[in-house]
A protein has these predicted regions:
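Conserved class I S-adenosyl-L-methionine
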Residues: 87-97
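N-terminal juxtadomain amphipathic helix
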Residues: 1-69
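A short glycine-rich, Lys/Arg-flanked "PGG" loop and its adjoining helix->strand segment in the class I
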Residues: 166-183
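Conserved SAM-binding strand-loop segment of SAM-dependent methyltransferases
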Residues: 126-142
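Conserved SAM-binding loop of SAM-dependent methyltransferases across substrates and taxa
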Residues: 98-108
Length: 200
């Protein structure tokens, strides 16, 4: 903790994306203490204490990337660039949500990882090759046994939600081919401040 400098205390907050119905207001909502820190070692900003992934990313997760026109357009532009410059034969997406990025490619060459079963079911119905689970070494080994390696691994707005970054990248290294490409998109606090936005 000596590398972390606390600079913003947001108090106790309920989970994001979950809105109570009128009949639920009488029940006590679980809240988490959000203290924002700057890490002098790696220059990253994060919350001081993480909470279990399953409390937010579960079978009731409400967000769908396809609901955002901006996200869909961004995925389309990026996928066109990838096809032109990288020409990947096998693609893995970590945190594939409802398949908004992967649907820009041939389903035969893509694999998605999605921990939220209610969202994963959507992509399964659309015949996407989606594996339910949280990204870690155990899942990466399972994927390696079945698919070997990938020449493109992509992840958007996912890595920031995973506590153990060392394990994240060890798992990626396990399934990324020798000359493979890794593309990660996650929010930048600096850009949020510049644009006066609460999200990317």
């Amino acid at each position: 903790m000596k590398n972390k400098i606390e600079f913003l205390d947001l108090g106790f907050q309920p989970l994001a994306n979950y809105y109570l119905r009128k009949n639920q207001i009488k029940y006590k909502q679980k809240k988490y203490r959000l203290i924002v820190c700057f890490n002098k070692y790696n220059n990253l900003v994060s919350i001081k204490k993480t909470f279990p992934s399953r409390s937010m990313f579960n079978d009731q997760y409400p967000y769908r990337s396809s609901m955002s026109k901006t996200m869909k357009n961004s995925f389309k532009i990026l996928s066109d660039q990838i096809k032109r410059k990288i020409k990947p034969k096998k693609i893995l997406e970590i945190g594939s949500n409802d398949g908004s990025f992967l649907r820009n490619f041939n389903k035969k060459v893509t694999v998605g990882i999605e921990p939220c079963k209610n969202v994963e079911k959507i992509t399964k119905k659309q015949k996407f090759n989606t594996i339910p689970g949280y990204w870690d070494l155990k899942l990466a080994k399972k994927i390696q046994r079945k698919y070997d390696s990938f020449d493109l691994i992509y992840s958007a707005n996912t890595i920031t939600h995973i506590k153990n970054l060392d394990e994240v990248f060890k798992a990626i290294n396990l399934v990324l081919s020798k000359n493979g490409v890794l593309i990660i998109e996650d929010p930048s606090l600096l850009e949020c401040l510049k644009r006066n936005t609460y999200d990317q």
